[in-house]
């Protein structure tokens, strides 16, 4: 008997992988932003909808990785409950951004804009000055 073709959309645990930012926006029901000023050039980009409520975009290039999340509301959507030794607050585009990581080598940023919550994690820590331009580049 013929093997059924795999559909383009894989659904597991409420996760749906799609192929573009536009499809991701449709899947979650709001316009999804993306990280456009990462400290590395992404060779691979993966788009995932979680439960039709949270957008996740994963960026990768070799060992360098970034994970961007956007959801409605003001909840921390990072899924990262680690205790970090260092935390710093800065204001970017009028939003209060919390950086977490090692002293002057932060790997996680969390912020809200009044409508959406955002988080961005990096595999390699960056100083606050670099994070400022990374967060400014989320559009």
Model-derived segments and spans:
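Short, solvent-exposed recognition patches
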Residues: 2-117
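Surface-exposed amphipathic alpha-helical segments
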Residues: 114-139
């Amino acid at each position: 008997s013929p093997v059924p073709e795999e559909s383009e959309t894989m659904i597991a645990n409420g996760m749906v992988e799609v192929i573009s930012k536009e499809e991701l926006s449709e899947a979650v029901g709001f316009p999804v932003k993306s990280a456009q000023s990462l400290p590395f050039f992404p060779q691979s980009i993966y788009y995932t909808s979680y439960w039709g409520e949270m957008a996740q975009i994963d960026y990768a290039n070799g060992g360098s990785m970034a994970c961007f999340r956007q959801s409605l509301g003001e909840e921390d959507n990072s899924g990262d409950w680690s205790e970090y030794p260092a935390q710093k607050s800065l204001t970017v585009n009028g939003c209060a951004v919390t950086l977490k990581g090692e002293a002057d080598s932060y790997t996680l940023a969390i912020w809200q804009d009044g409508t959406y919550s955002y988080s961005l994690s990096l595999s390699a820590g960056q100083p606050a000055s670099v994070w400022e331009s990374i967060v400014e580049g989320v559009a």
